Amino acid sequence: MELDRDSVHIRLLKVAGQVSAIDRMIAEGDSAERILVQINAAKSALHKVALFVTEDALSDLLGRDEGKSGDAAVVIERFSSLL
């Protein structure tokens, strides 16, 4: 699997927009509840980006020779270093 860089880029632009909106909400004195809702939405969106990148990295590791040879310990060790 290859990372869809355009899709990830678009998602990151949306996250940047959310963060900008949060900054504006704080500057305008919006309620903490509304600000926290938006912060959680931005965190969730960024987490989805991280999942795409992680999935791509794991797929890459499993596609290498050590993944094909069944040496799961090597793949797990390398994957763990990415976290």
Where would I find each of the regions flagged by the language model?
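Solvent-exposed interaction patches of small proteins and small membrane subunits
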Residues: 1-83
